[in-house]
Swiss-Prot record:
The lineage of its organism: Eukaryota, Metazoa, Cnidaria, Anthozoa, Hexacorallia. One of its GO terms (molecular function) is toxin activity. It comes from Montipora capitata (Rice coral). Its main location: secreted. This is Small cysteine-rich protein 1 2. It is found in: Secreted; Nematocyst. It comes from the Eukaryota. Residues 20-39 form a propeptide.
């Protein structure tokens, strides 16, 4: 009798868990897509069409390093030509 009761409890537990919606698949659009949640859309670099690039990476083609504020200490602003 004890084994049957344990099996019934196990089936009830599995049915309860499997009926729950998966919240991991929902996308939260309220979070910023920048790393570490840094918000740069209103920065001087972004206003002039620049992008914050890590200092270890060269600026992309057709861009140059410009001295505009708004990037973190480990990044620099790359502006379009």
């Amino acid at each position: 009798m004890g084994v049957n009761f344990n099996i019934c409890l196990l089936l009830l537990l599995v049915a309860t868990i499997s009926s729950q919606p998966l919240k991991a698949t929902e996308k939260d659009d309220s979070t910023d897509e920048n790393p570490f949640g840094i918000y740069r859309r209103g920065s001087q670099c972004a206003v002039y069409g620049g992008r914050c690039i890590p200092t270890s990476v060269r600026c992309p083609p057709n861009t140059f390093q410009c001295d505009l504020s708004g990037c973190s200490w480990s990044e620099r602003c790359c502006c379009h030509l």
